[in-house]
Every structure is written in structure tokens, then in C-alpha cells.
């Protein structure tokens, strides 16, 4: 089992780091009481071997000592990585002022600046224990995400899930699509009597559409579009991409195009899911 511990001063980007971990498949728990670490891992052992927790000033009581004790009790095969995120006092003050969020220690009679300084002192025991320190003072959300991925994976690239869905316009458009292509202008197998009862997954329909130059050109252009822009979509903190292909009834043209695109995108780098809505969720 792998355990990642994320700590740091409020406003330094812990929530961003947790989102990255969640996208990587980690079961994330924010502000877990430290004595519960062992119980959490034992409970998740059979269902999830990737776990991430955040530790912050809200469960402060002798954190460093308690954390050290809890980690010593974990099974020896547990792989532990830890991060401490920090920013300069000036940057943290600016971030809290801009977002108008309440600092966890501001409920007492102290100023925001005093709360920020006190939090830094309280978290010093944790900061001395961790493997990786990240100063986020000059980082934006995307740069911080890349750094976390780089440390965990050895690369800033992440596995983008591509969902390709065929549908029929007469049954309504899918609401979850990021990109939608209307292929109703392509030659329609519906008008071929012997092809009408078949679908775009059947060989006779595939052979019919494969003979159409317009079909080849469209597939090539869609593939080229995403090959060009996919790296930029991946760097934009995106975990999945949904591409919808629509024809009139969702039986022939859209099914064939979606099926062909799924095969072309399945190059090992991406997880590709093909769904044909009007065929009762049949997978390609």
C-alpha cells in the first residue's frame, strides 16, 4: 500500500495537491486525525492500495510526535511519501486577502499576519519530517500540479481518460460532452436496404463507410485535431475528455466514426472508453 501525506501552511496549495492525488487514483482524506491513520489503512486495504491524507494546523496537538508514532506502527510494506507545501508570509497574506477566506487560527483574537506566522511555528515539527518541500510562492495551480506529478510519477504527464460516445440527434444531445461532432452529412447506410437493420459495429456497414472518401477525411481531421491539442488539454489539469459523435439515429455513421476514433486513440498512453448510447451501451 502507498500512503502520501500532504501538509503545509493554509493557503499554500494543499487542496490542489490532494486533487492531483485524487486524479491519480488515491483515496484522499482531508484533515484526518492522526491516531486514525492505521485504522484507515486497515479498512481500505482490500479496496484501495493508494491513500493520501492531509495534515494541517486543525489537528495540531503534538502533531510531529503523534505522526511519527503512527507511522512507526504501520506495516513495513507500506510505502510512505510526504510533502510539505509552503509560501512566503507575504504571498499567504495576499492570497487570504484576495479570497477573503478565514484563516484556521484567525478565530482567536489575532490578526491574519499573526495567524500565518503562528501556523508556521506550529507546523515546524511536521516540516522537519517530510520527504519533499515545495515552495508555492511563485507557482500557479498548474505548475504546482506538475511538480506533484513529477515527484510521484517521475513525469508531469498524466493518464488522460478519453470517452468517445456515439449518439442520435433525434434522441437528444449528450450534456456531458466536451467536444461534439455532427456527422449527419456523411453518406447514410440507412438508405441501403440490406444495411438498415445493422449497426456501425457490423462488418457490412463498416465496409460501406470505409469506401467513402468523405468518411476517411473526417476521421483524419478529427484525429489530427486532437493529436495537435491533446498535450495542451493534458497540461490543463484535465483528467478526462468526452468526445460525442452524432448522426440522425445513432445506429450507423456515428457508431462507426466513434469506433474508428477509439481504435486510433488507443495508443497505450491514454485510457479510451467507447460507448454507443443508442445501442444500449454496447462497448466498442
Swiss-Prot record:
The keyword Nucleotide-binding applies. The keyword Membrane does not apply. Keywords: ATP-binding, GTP-binding, Nucleotide-binding. GTP binds at residues 56-59. Pfam families: PapZ_C (PF22740), RapZ-like_N (PF03668). GO terms for molecular function: ATP binding; GTP binding. ATP binds at residues 8-15. InterPro entries: P-loop_NTPase, RapZ-like, RapZ-like_N, RapZ_C. It comes from the Bacteria. Displays ATPase and GTPase activities. Belongs to the RapZ-like family. PANTHER family: RNASE ADAPTER PROTEIN RAPZ. This is Nucleotide-binding protein Sden_0486. It comes from Shewanella denitrificans (strain OS217 / ATCC BAA-1090 / DSM 15013). The lineage of its organism: Bacteria, Pseudomonadati, Pseudomonadota, Gammaproteobacteria, Alteromonadales.
